[in-house]
Amino acid sequence: ILIRISGYGQTGPCREKAGFGTPAAAFSGLTYLQGYPDRPPVSPPLALVDYMTGTYGALAAMMALYHLKTSDASEGQVADIALFESAFRMLEPLVAEYSLTGKVKERGGHIGQGAAPSGTFRCKDGKWVVMVTSTQRTFVRLAEVMGRMDLLEDPRFDTNPHRSENRQAIYDIVQEWFGSPD
């Protein structure tokens, strides 16, 4: 079993380039999505792409071992894993989104871009909390905790698609509830 890990794969125009996680994150498009819309893209603050690629390599080795042990195969396998492909793998849903809408996903800052409300909220003590309400049930629970059952009747917030259309408004309401530093 041979696991090959490189920056950009064994073939193609970039095969000779050095393989480092930060440039691979940028090459994949991952860096473009990090940060705020009105500011430059931000690289991941740790070796995220390196860790992901190592995980994919370990998984490939385990699958190749499993294949050897559970089949009549007598030869090993070769897996070619590129750093940028590991990062790009996380972005695959955006390819489908682009093909449907023709819109390039933009940086969202600290406000989550999936379910709403979601994102990073500043608390009264100056610390931060990350929260996501990915289902109607979790939004109902949030409304209960906030003492804001009226949000469930507001047509802007009664479903996740409606909350997503009014992302900033619901974010602001939740941020006010969390408080802000004095």
Briefly describe each language-model feature range:
Residues 117-182:
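Aromatic-enriched alpha-helical interface/lid elements that frame and gate functional surfaces
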